[in-house]
Amino acid sequence: DKVRAREARKALGDLGWAGVEFGQDMPATEFVGYDYDAIDDAKVLAIVADGEHVDEIVAGMDAIVVLDQTPFYAEMGGQTADHGYLCDSADESVENLEGKGNALSFEVNNVQKNKGDKYMHYGKLLRGSLKVGDTVTASIDTERRAAIRRAHSATHLLDAALMKILGDHVHQAGSLVEPDRLRFDFSHF
């Protein structure tokens, strides 16, 4: 939603939400989320905490983490972002996906993609410490993604139904796609 996006841009401050300054010296994040729900070899390229680039965060800190690759879908086009965890274990059990039983657990509650195609994982470090250069397991909440996919498909069905019933002049003007609801904006004449 707009408030969350504004807060995300505000959190970056002068670090360049547009991607001009933020991560200019690093490659774009590779999105692997169409093929994988979890990967165990994501490298931490950058960390931002309290509006500053930092080398390390410790438990209890809110931060933005940029990875070299990610299975997390970023918020865009009205579709909300994936949630999940960055952990230190390749164990894909439910406990690991919830960040339990690991020395390191970073809960991801928002993901934004900047103009430089860096995926910024917003969240809180629940346990341990996380450093630039660390390799982590990145795991999405698969139930949440499935619910978002259903809502996304519903927007396409709604668009087709409106065009069939009201005519070809109907056009989608926007949408909001979340796990538990969707909003479909359209123009009619």
What are these regions, as identified by a protein language model?
Residues D1-F189:
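A glycine- and charged-residue-rich anion-binding loop/surface
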